[in-house]
């Protein structure tokens, strides 16, 4: 049995401890917002938070989550009210949308660590997240917009 907190709820699962966290999230817990992209931690589509830090769930075994807190895109905000989600929509960031959950999860860590990031901070923090549609300029604008919303009390 592996126990951890997922999106503020404690779970205990009887799974092979070497199973990638991504597959436990998707197949055992039904949390399909986290995507499979490359399976090699190169694209960022599978990004989740483990004790507040962004990790690639496709290469992290579920045993790594034991006794810790995991947050997925579903836990960022269940009603799309997080400033990042609102900014993403306002800036028309999504095209195909496949990378978006990973992009949002990486951006959330960035804004927690640097509430007013520079363009360079954003580029550095988002380097491991690939967008096949090339929406990088809109992603940067959305992160700046969310930072502004959060600094003026628009955070949830």
Model feature map: region roles:
Residues 1-156:
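Signature of N-terminal electron-transfer/Fe-S-associated modules in redox systems
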